[in-house]
Each structure stands twice: as C-alpha cells, then as structure tokens.
Amino acid sequence: QHPLKGMHIIVDAGNGNGGFFEKILSALGADTKGSQFLDPDGRFPNHIPNPEDREAMASVCKAVEESDADLGVIFDTDVDRSAIIGRKGEPINRNSLIALISSVILDEHPGSTIVTDSVTSDGLAEYISEKGGRHHRFRRGYKNVINEGIRLNEAGEECWLAIETSGHAALRENHFLDDGAYLAAKLIVFAAKLYKEGKQVHEVIASLKQPKESKEIRIKLTDPDFKAQGAKALEDMKAKAEGVEGWTIVEPNYEGLR
C-alpha cells in the first residue's frame, strides 16, 4: 500500500542521522524529490541540523517552495527534534509546531493537558484553550517537561503531550520518549488526511496569534557564585516590573519571571 501517494514531501536531515526518513516516506508512496543533506557528515557542511536555527529553516523552506512540495520535514542531528514546513514554504516550528501537534492531540484526547517549557507565547496558551485543552507552562529542559507530563498523569491529570519550543516532543502514546521521527510521522499522517480533503496544515493554525517580536538574548553571568547573581537579577527585574503601570507578573510561574 502507498498511503502517501500523490503527496510531495521533502526531508532535510542536515547531514545528521535523519536521512533514513526519506526512504520511509518514499516506500509509502510519497514523492521525495528535492530532499536534501541526507547523508551523515559530522562536519555539517550545509547548515547546522537544528529546527530552531534560522539558516537551517530558511534552507528547507526554500527547498519546499522551489520544489513546489506539499510539506517539508527537518530534523536535528540525532532525530529527537523536528519541525514541519508548510505548502508555501512557511516554517512551522516553535509555537506554531506546538499548536499544530496540540490540535492533533486534542482531537484525539479532548481536554488533555499540554505541557510546554517556559518560553511559549500567550497566543499559544489561548490557542490550546480554544481547542479545549489546558496549557501547563513549565520549565525549560526537555527532561523537565517530559517528567512533568509523567507526573501529571500519575497524579490523575491526563497529559498526552509534553513538548519544548526547541522541537523536543514526547507523547504518552509513545511512552513519553522524545522522538522527532515519531512526531514528524504523526503530523504527516494528519497532513495526509487533510491533503485528501484539499486542505493544508497551515490552515489548522491560522488562528494562532503570533508574537509581534520574539528574540532570545543570552547574558553571561560573570560572578563565580552565578546562582546568587542570577537570583539577584530576577529580583531586580521583578521590582522593575512591579513598578511599571500596566504590567502584570504571571502566576503561577515555574521558572524565571514572566
């Protein structure tokens, strides 16, 4: 059987270990012409294999657009992270990726809690709520996110998805393993169903509100007692935020200051 026959899907392995995925899609009937950087090469001569990296995403988005593909998939080095590219070359990573897989999960498991790391957007929280789920924004670090999902289930709260903005995703149905290939496969199955209906994945997250601006800044802590220095910085930021009219500190909050 060839369930993906008629679909054109590009794989970008970034010269990491994800090249095998193209062979699987091809065997299932997909047209994979335009797939790139499938052979492992630890020098990573084309771009860093990272679904968060702007250069990497720009490369695969361009490949999808130029090949007129229906979908694109990009993996990190060891295939525990992935992201999707839509029909017109639009990137579906970070908040958009979480929104898309959350939509799939909430269709299958209405009311599920979705655990994420701490840097997800307010727009994502609204999207999950509108889909009937509960957004549990936790700490950064894929182990923190996954372990929190496991803990909630053990406490009697249904959680079927734990995911970081980096693309680390763990599903309860897959024993909470952080498996980028499993995430990609689940989204491709969903995309194939939409394809038969004449729809595209980006339509599913059209209502997701995107941040006006999003930028990550990493500040070096120079004091040998870096924990104390970091804690002092958070205290100072909190004092500053409390003094600004119209600003509200989010509670509950499990990491940093929001």
Regions found by a protein language model. Give the residues of each.
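Gly/Ser-rich phosphate-binding catalytic loop and adjacent alpha/beta segment
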Residues: 1-43
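Short beta-strand segments
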Residues: 12, 74-76, 162-163
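Gly/Ser/Thr-rich loops at beta-strand to alpha-helix junctions
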Residues: 14-19, 79-80, 120-122, 167
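Short acidic, glycine/serine/threonine-rich loops at helix termini
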Residues: 20-24, 45-48, 82-88, 124-130, ...
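N-terminal small/polar loop signature for handling phosphorylated ligands or for N-terminal nucleophile
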Residues: 26-85
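Short hydrophobic/aromatic-enriched beta-strand-loop microsegments
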Residues: 31-37, 91-96, 132-140
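Phosphate-binding and adjacent anionic-ligand microenvironments
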Residues: 71, 109-258
